[in-house]
Amino acid sequence: MGTIRKSTASIDRFFAEAHDISFHNYVSYRTVEFLWRGARYRLVSTGDLYVLDYSGLPALVHPFESVYKNEHISCVSVADQRNYYVRRRKQIRLKDLVWAAFGDRDLPKGSHIICKNGNWQSCGINNLEVDQYGVSSKGSSL
């Protein structure tokens, strides 16, 4: 089905269907969670492999192709109950999730995403904001 790219109707369709999107940052791993088409997706980064928990059934997916803004999230679907999975059914870039929250421009050089409430473990997509060189840029429309 291809990669969802910024500035396309694909992102709009995905976010019209995805709900409860949240980012969680822990000491040794990161997760992105969302509901999509009746199933809860939970992607876990442990540095090398990314695990997708699809309706309680774990499956290994491809590692992100690079770090931070250019990461790729591979969503897979369960084909049957014999642990056979269809890979590459949908790919969503983590950067695209951020774009959908902040707008259609890339992050300014030297910027990164922070959680406004200071707690990544309970940070929803609406609590994300841009931080540049250690100075919060609240109100930035990106």
Regions found by a protein language model. Give the residues of each.
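Acidic catalytic motifs of isoprenoid enzymes
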Residues: K116
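Conserved recognition-core residues within compact binding domains
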Residues: G2-G110, N119-L142
